[in-house]
């Protein structure tokens, strides 16, 4: 198994929505979150914008796309907007490696941290990120831009109390 991590090209963006849709199927294991399996995903046009901005990274196995991470600048942090791995490739360390790769890219570009929002108690969400070195941030200490991300999620139907913001400091 040959794993490649690199920036996403515009030509590869068409494959990314299917990866996100597959990744969401894992939420069928949690009845109260099963709706995520059919929730709105990032469009090809949105993926093209992330890639054009240099904010999309791809994980490939034997030259076949299996995962991606898209991000945006949020102050001095690189905010992970979405990390998805095809269901078949989850649990094999590819996501961990992709986060490590993007962390190194972010460090080289001068970002001070990686940030994200995620579910507090879903095993492959906050508990996994904590094992990778991310720390959960208390709502009262959130920087304004990250607080706004949390509020935007709630405005779009996410239950505020079920989610959290996390940060990985880049040294």
Residue positions per predicted region:
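A short beta-loop-alpha structural element at the N-terminal edge
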Residues: 4-18
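Conserved GNAT-fold acetyl-CoA-binding loop/helix
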Residues: 21-46
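Conserved beta-strand in the GNAT
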Residues: 58, 64-72, 79-84
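A short, internal acetyl-CoA/4′-phosphopantetheine-binding micro-motif in the GNAT/acyltransferase core
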Residues: 83-90, 118-120
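Conserved acetyl-CoA-binding loop-helix of GNAT-fold acetyltransferases
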Residues: 85, 91-104, 131
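Conserved GNAT acetyl-CoA-binding A-motif
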Residues: 106-118
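Conserved beta-strand-loop-alpha-helix junction that forms the acyl-donor binding cleft
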Residues: 116-125, 142-147
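Conserved acetyl-CoA-binding loop of GNAT-fold acetyltransferases
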Residues: 130-138
């Amino acid at each position: 198994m040959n794993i490649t991590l690199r920036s996403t090209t515009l030509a590869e963006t068409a494959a990314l929505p299917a990866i996100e849709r597959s990744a969401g199927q894992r939420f069928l294991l949690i009845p109260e979150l099963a709706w995520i399996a059919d929730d709105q995903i990032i469009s090809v046009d949105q993926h093209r914008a992330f890639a054009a901005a240099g904010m999309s990274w791809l994980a490939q196995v034997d030259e076949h796309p299996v995962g991606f991470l898209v991000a945006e600048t949020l102050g001095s942090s690189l905010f992970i907007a979405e990390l998805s791995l095809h269901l078949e490739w989850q649990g094999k360390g590819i996501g961990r490696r992709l986060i490590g790769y993007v962390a190194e890219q972010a460090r080289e570009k001068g970002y001070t941290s990686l940030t994200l929002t995620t579910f507090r108690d879903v095993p492959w969400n906050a508990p996994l990120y904590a094992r990778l070195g991310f720390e959960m941030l208390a709502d009262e200490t959130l920087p304004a831009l990250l607080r706004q991300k949390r509020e935007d999620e709630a405005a779009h139907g996410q239950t505020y109390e079920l989610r959290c913001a996390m940060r990985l400091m880049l040294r």
